[in-house]
């Protein structure tokens, strides 16, 4: 079981991720609605794994990832984004993202990623 922070501006996406991950036995410690909120909640809750959307208001996922990795070089962040954003995914990997997944994704795809990262 992993302690997870979900960062996504879409309420629907957060709800779907919560359902999938809780259904797999993981604990959602917090949800954040933008990158800045995500950085703050990362510091507050110290999750084992973060799922992070890339395109968000106030602070996008790439900037939030950069901030989180500056605070914790071992942070395990899975970037979640829409199809057609391959360049941003490459940027995310360069910034230290542990994994990435493209929407829509299969539930077992994200649960396997979270499980692998939680064990590492």
Predicted regions: what they are:
Residues 11-30:
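Two-component/phosphorelay signaling modules centered on CheY-like receiver
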Residues 83-84:
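Short, conserved "switch-loop" micro-motifs in signal-transduction and mechanochemical regulators
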Residues 105-114:
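C-terminal output helix
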Residues 34-37, 60-63:
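Acidic catalytic/metal-coordinating carboxylates
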Residues 45-51:
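Active-site beta3 strand of CheY-like receiver
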Residues 56:
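Receiver (REC) domain active-site loop signature in two-component systems and cognate sites
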């Amino acid at each position: 079981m992993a302690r997870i922070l979900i960062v996504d501006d879409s309420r629907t996406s957060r709800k779907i991720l919560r359902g999938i991950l809780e259904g797999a036995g993981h604990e959602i410690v917090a949800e954040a609605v933008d990158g800045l909120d995500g950085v703050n909640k990362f510091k507050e809750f110290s999750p084992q794994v973060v799922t992070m959307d890339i395109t968000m208001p106030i602070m996008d996922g790439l900037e939030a990832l950069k901030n989180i990795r500056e605070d914790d070089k071992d942070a395990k962040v899975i970037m979640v984004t829409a199809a057609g954003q391959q360049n941003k995914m490459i940027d995310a990997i360069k910034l230290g993202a542990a994994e990435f997944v493209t929407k829509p994704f299969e539930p077992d795809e994200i649960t396997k990623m979270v499980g692998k990262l939680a064990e590492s």
